[in-house]
């Protein structure tokens, strides 16, 4: 059975805090509690799903591994009993579920064993792919190595030694589920012995320990289309975990993450950049050379340009991956105050300042307006 995303299972964002994850789990546990939803199989499944998600996301190390590699990063075989998996001789003791009043309710549903009769699709995997802005905008092809679980070639995924066959589970009599009565509680849950398969492996394969799978890695080629951005996903069909008992494999989702750039910031289809200009260039106008992802362009600065003014270079942005017009490059200028002046430069600026004294309202209207407001403020408050 394909596993859902753990963050989606709890209804939280991927950057959710520990407290947000804990609150979300409590809310889901109360809503889908089996005692509140007797006989509701869907509620029971959601309850177990939320519990499993919380077990991973509440652990910093497991969460980091899951964020990087998805379900494979937290070891899909974890939680399977001993050498034989959930249906092997190392399976959990049936009595363990009676540890306390809520032990049966909060006990997880074991994963399906390799020797069961039911057929399930493999779990989906996720891989975080970090790209430069240039590669994201232009498109590229990269090779990635991902951890995966492959079908054991020694037993062909059956989990048993050659000549051996799974046996009917003695705990659930082949049903895959057990009902537990404890006081006022009556809970039906996945059989802890066979993990819901209805069968147990008494003579497990030595190579895979009865799981039917072995840990491995594979190299895949990923074609990244031009225009992708952080948060986009690329689906590689059939590259997830193999299915159980002959089921189809899951998919691999490549999650795009674009690194910060030295010059540009992505804003949808547009690119933004900061351009420092000198005080003389701002006052007199001129041209300044700015970079684009296609090369250099000359940006025309009109006389009297103010700091913070944004100039548009059309067609130098991003062509959206889902179609639409190409974006623009938005250049925000900042007038830079000169520093480390020579004596001569200071004298020239002082002379320039004196020529502005009588005509400031004409050349610097914002400053003159601000000074007028400040004077009025002082007069009103007699400061």
Curated annotation (Swiss-Prot):
<feature type="binding site">
    <location>
        <position position="172"/>
    </location>
    <ligand>
        <name>Zn(2+) 2</name>
    </ligand>
</feature>
<keyword id="KW-0346">Stress response</keyword>
<feature type="binding site">
    <location>
        <position position="208"/>
    </location>
    <ligand>
        <name>Zn(2+) 1</name>
    </ligand>
</feature>
<dbReference type="GO" id="GO:0051082">
    <property type="term" value="F:unfolded protein binding"/>
</dbReference>
<dbReference type="Pfam" id="PF01556">
    <property type="entry name" value="DnaJ_C"/>
</dbReference>
<dbReference type="InterPro" id="IPR018253">
    <property type="entry name" value="DnaJ_domain_CS"/>
</dbReference>
<dbReference type="GO" id="GO:0008270">
    <property type="term" value="F:zinc ion binding"/>
</dbReference>
<dbReference type="InterPro" id="IPR008971">
    <property type="entry name" value="HSP40/DnaJ_pept-bd"/>
</dbReference>
<dbReference type="InterPro" id="IPR001623">
    <property type="entry name" value="DnaJ_domain"/>
</dbReference>
<feature type="repeat" description="CXXCXGXG motif">
    <location>
        <begin position="191"/>
        <end position="198"/>
    </location>
</feature>
<protein>
    <recommendedName>
        <fullName>Chaperone protein DnaJ</fullName>
    </recommendedName>
</protein>
<keyword id="KW-0863">Zinc-finger</keyword>
<dbReference type="GO" id="GO:0005737">
    <property type="term" value="C:cytoplasm"/>
</dbReference>
<dbReference type="GO" id="GO:0042026">
    <property type="term" value="P:protein refolding"/>
</dbReference>
<feature type="binding site">
    <location>
        <position position="169"/>
    </location>
    <ligand>
        <name>Zn(2+) 2</name>
    </ligand>
</feature>
<keyword id="KW-0235">DNA replication</keyword>
<dbReference type="Pfam" id="PF00684">
    <property type="entry name" value="DnaJ_CXXCXGXG"/>
</dbReference>
<dbReference type="GO" id="GO:0051085">
    <property type="term" value="P:chaperone cofactor-dependent protein refolding"/>
</dbReference>
<keyword id="KW-0479">Metal-binding</keyword>
<dbReference type="Pfam" id="PF00226">
    <property type="entry name" value="DnaJ"/>
</dbReference>
<feature type="binding site">
    <location>
        <position position="155"/>
    </location>
    <ligand>
        <name>Zn(2+) 1</name>
    </ligand>
</feature>
<comment type="function">
    <text>Participates actively in the response to hyperosmotic and heat shock by preventing the aggregation of stress-denatured proteins and by disaggregating proteins, also in an autonomous, DnaK-independent fashion. Unfolded proteins bind initially to DnaJ; upon interaction with the DnaJ-bound protein, DnaK hydrolyzes its bound ATP, resulting in the formation of a stable complex. GrpE releases ADP from DnaK; ATP binding to DnaK triggers the release of the substrate protein, thus completing the reaction cycle.</text>
</comment>
<dbReference type="InterPro" id="IPR012724">
    <property type="entry name" value="DnaJ"/>
</dbReference>
<dbReference type="InterPro" id="IPR001305">
    <property type="entry name" value="HSP_DnaJ_Cys-rich_dom"/>
</dbReference>
<feature type="zinc finger region" description="CR-type">
    <location>
        <begin position="139"/>
        <end position="217"/>
    </location>
</feature>
<dbReference type="InterPro" id="IPR036410">
    <property type="entry name" value="HSP_DnaJ_Cys-rich_dom_sf"/>
</dbReference>
<dbReference type="GO" id="GO:0005524">
    <property type="term" value="F:ATP binding"/>
</dbReference>
<dbReference type="GO" id="GO:0006260">
    <property type="term" value="P:DNA replication"/>
</dbReference>
<feature type="repeat" description="CXXCXGXG motif">
    <location>
        <begin position="205"/>
        <end position="212"/>
    </location>
</feature>
<feature type="region of interest" description="Disordered">
    <location>
        <begin position="230"/>
        <end position="249"/>
    </location>
</feature>
<dbReference type="InterPro" id="IPR002939">
    <property type="entry name" value="DnaJ_C"/>
</dbReference>
<keyword id="KW-0963">Cytoplasm</keyword>
<feature type="binding site">
    <location>
        <position position="191"/>
    </location>
    <ligand>
        <name>Zn(2+) 2</name>
    </ligand>
</feature>
<comment type="subunit">
    <text>Homodimer.</text>
</comment>
<feature type="domain" description="J">
    <location>
        <begin position="5"/>
        <end position="70"/>
    </location>
</feature>
<dbReference type="GO" id="GO:0031072">
    <property type="term" value="F:heat shock protein binding"/>
</dbReference>
<keyword id="KW-0677">Repeat</keyword>
<dbReference type="GO" id="GO:0009408">
    <property type="term" value="P:response to heat"/>
</dbReference>
<keyword id="KW-0862">Zinc</keyword>
<comment type="similarity">
    <text>Belongs to the DnaJ family.</text>
</comment>
<keyword id="KW-0143">Chaperone</keyword>
<feature type="binding site">
    <location>
        <position position="194"/>
    </location>
    <ligand>
        <name>Zn(2+) 2</name>
    </ligand>
</feature>
């Amino acid at each position: 059975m394909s596993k859902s995303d753990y963050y989606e299972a709890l209804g939280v964002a991927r950057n959710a805090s520990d407290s947000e994850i804990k609150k979300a789990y409590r809310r889901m546990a109360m809503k889908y509690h089996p005692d509140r939803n007797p006989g509701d199989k869907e509620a029971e499944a959601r309850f177990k799903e939320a519990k499993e998600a919380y077990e991973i996301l509440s652990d910093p190390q497991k969460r980091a591994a899951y964020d990087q590699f998805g379900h494979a990063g937290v070891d899909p075989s974890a939680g399977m009993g001993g050498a034989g998996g959930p249906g092997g001789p190392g399976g959990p003791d049936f009595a363990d579920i009676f540890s306390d009043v809520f032990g049966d309710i909060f006990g997880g549903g074991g994963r399906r064993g390799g020797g069961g009769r039911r057929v399930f699709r493999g779990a989906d995997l996720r891989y975080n792919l970090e790209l430069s802005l240039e590669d994201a905008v232009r498109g590229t092809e990269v090779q990635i190595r991902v951890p995966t679980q492959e079908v054991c070639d020694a037993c062909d995924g059956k989990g048993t030694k050659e000549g051996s066959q799974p046996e009917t589970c003695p705990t659930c009599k082949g049903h895959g589920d057990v009902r537990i009565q404890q006081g006022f509680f009556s809970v039906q849950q996945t059989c802890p012995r066979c993990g819901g398969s209805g069968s147990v492996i008494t003579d497990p394969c030595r190579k895979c320990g009865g799981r039917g799978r072995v840990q491995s890695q594979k190299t895949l080629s990923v074609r990244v289309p031009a225009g992708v951005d952080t948060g986009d996903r690329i689906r590689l069909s059939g590259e997830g975990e193999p299915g159980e008992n002959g089921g189809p494999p899951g998919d691999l989702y490549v999650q795009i993450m674009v690194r910060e750039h030295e010059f540009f910031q992505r804003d949808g289809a547009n690119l933004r950049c900061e351009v420092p200009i000198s005080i003389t260039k701002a006052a007199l106008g001129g041209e300044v050379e700015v970079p684009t992802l296609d090369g250099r362009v000359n940006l025309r600065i009109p006389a009297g340009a103010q700091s913070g003014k944004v100039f548009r270079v059309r067609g130098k942005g991003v062509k959206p991956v889902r179609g639409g017009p190409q974006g623009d490059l938005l250049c925000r200028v900042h007038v830079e105050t000169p520093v480390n002046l020579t004596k001569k430069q200071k004298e020239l600026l002082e002379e320039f300042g004196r020529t502005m004294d009588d005509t400031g309202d004409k050349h610097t209207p914002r400053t003159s307006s601000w000074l007028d407001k400040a004077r009025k403020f002082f007069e009103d408050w007699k400061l």
